[in-house]
């Protein structure tokens, strides 16, 4: 498995402990789903301005958001629908996709919701990972299922709501 985390913002300090927590959370999401394939996932930590630009380019919404996911493999609720995904043939890995997280939004929302920055960051990260795995919140049932999965990971990491 390969996890790439790139920090392209300078507004919020990202410590080694935060990076380790992020990697652990990603691995836990995939283990929770019993994802058996070698994989690659890229995380980009950005600021409000950059995520606003990308949100506008990709979704025609001209405002910053907290997290954006760009899945590469066609999945639905954790199951690969098509084998036409992107594979790294040299390494034999499935490239799941990219997740962008606004560190400014994560900080703002942690203060708004009254919990730690780490909890909010990992909530957003797991949200993005489950989107890469084909989960969505487009119906009440699917939303409940997705958020239950996120909360299970947060609970395992002792990052429950206060």
UniProtKB/Swiss-Prot annotation:
Family stated for the protein in its record: Belongs to the endoribonuclease YbeY family.
GO cellular component: cytoplasm
GO molecular function ontology, one term from the record: RNA endonuclease activity
Functional description taken from the UniProt entry: Single strand-specific metallo-endoribonuclease involved in late-stage 70S ribosome quality control and in maturation of the 3' terminus of the 16S rRNA.
Record localization: Cytoplasm
One Pfam match: YbeY
Subcellular location, principal: cytoplasm
One GO-annotated biological process of the protein: rRNA processing
InterPro entries: MetalPrtase_cat_dom_sf_prd (IPR023091), YbeY (IPR002036)
Keywords carried by this UniProt record: Cytoplasm, Endonuclease, Hydrolase, Metal-binding, Nuclease, Ribosome biogenesis, rRNA processing, Zinc
Protein name, UniProt field: Endoribonuclease YbeY
Source organism (scientific name): Acetivibrio thermocellus (strain ATCC 27405 / DSM 1237 / JCM 9322 / NBRC 103400 / NCIMB 10682 / NRRL B-4536 / VPI 7372) (Clostridium thermocellum)
Cofactor: Zn(2+)
């Amino acid at each position: 498995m390969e996890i790439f985390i790139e920090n392209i913002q300078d507004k919020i300090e990202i410590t080694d402990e935060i990076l380790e927590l992020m990697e652990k959370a990603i691995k836990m999401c995939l283990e929770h789903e019993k994802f058996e394939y070698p994989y690659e996932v890229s995380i980009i930590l950005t600021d409000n301005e950059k995520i606003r630009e990308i949100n506008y380019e990709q979704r025609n919404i001209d405002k910053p958001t907290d997290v954006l996911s760009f899945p590469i493999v066609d999945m639905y609720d954790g199951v690969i629908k098509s084998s036409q995904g992107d594979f790294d043939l040299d390494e034999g890995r499935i490239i799941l996709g990219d997740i962008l997280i606004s560190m400014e939004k994560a900080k703002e929302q942690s203060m708004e919701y009254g919990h730690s920055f780490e909890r909010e960051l990992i909530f957003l990260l797991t949200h993005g990972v489950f989107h890469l795995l084909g989960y969505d919140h487009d119906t009440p049932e699917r939303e409940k299922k997705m958020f239950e999965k996120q909360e299970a990971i947060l609970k395992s990491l002792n990052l429950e709501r206060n």
